[in-house]
């Protein structure tokens, strides 16, 4: 099992073999950061609909048209790229945005979703980030119902979190994401 392999590598004594094996891991990290619960200091998003009232057929991943979304932020949170992953097919869209504001997210996600056929625009699951404060406008513009995950629960959007980790190979943390054109982002999404 994959977890056994990771545990065996992390249990090795410090040395050249351990370094070489860690480089081969998917994230290339020498240890895992322990997760702990924290206090939610963000304000509530108005009129948000919880993931717990989301129809069960979305969870089954049998019907296309249900998306998971997130925002990848660049250096000093000044630039950002929106990510949308279709839950059934794994189809990925990267959306260039001016910044990480609610207005940019609303405009970017609305434009990206409206490029898709109506049959594959049913719902989107998102975290409780401030950039989704204008979720009602996205729903109005696209017809996509938006559901919000519980705070500090990234596993409720597992496909998107996994994809974001893979995208970071091409768009590393701490870099200016505004230098990438939409065409470059489309190429990254295709890979």
Language model regions located:
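Basic, flexible linker segments flanking DNA-binding modules
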Residues: 2-59
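Short conserved beta-strand segments at catalytic cores or DNA/RNA-binding microdomains
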Residues: 59, 72, 76-93
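Two-metal-ion RNase H-like nuclease active-site motif
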Residues: 64-74
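Acidic/histidine-rich, metal-coordinating catalytic segments
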Residues: 119-134, 152
């Amino acid at each position: 099992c994959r977890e056994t392999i990771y545990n065996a590598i992390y249990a090795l004594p410090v040395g050249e073999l351990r370094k070489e094996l860690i480089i081969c891991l998917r994230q290339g990290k020498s240890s895992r950061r322990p997760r702990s619960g924290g206090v939610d200091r963000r304000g509530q998003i108005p009129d948000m609909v919880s993931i717990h009232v989301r129809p069960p057929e979305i969870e089954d991943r049998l019907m296309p048209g249900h998306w998971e979304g997130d925002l990848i932020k660049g250096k000093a949170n000044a630039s950002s790229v929106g990510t949308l992953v279709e839950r059934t097919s794994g189809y990925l869209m990267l959306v260039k945005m001016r910044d990480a504001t609610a207005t940019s997210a609303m405009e970017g996600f609305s434009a990206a979703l409206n490029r898709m056929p109506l049959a594959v625009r049913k719902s989107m699951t998102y975290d409780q980030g401030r950039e989704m404060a204008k979720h009602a406008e996205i729903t109005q513009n696209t017809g996509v119902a938006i559901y919000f995950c519980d705070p500090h629960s990234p596993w409720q959007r597992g496909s998107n979190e996994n994809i974001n980790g893979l995208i970071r190979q091409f768009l590393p943390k701490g870099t200016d994401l505004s230098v990438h054109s939409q065409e470059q982002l489309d190429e990254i999404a295709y890979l």
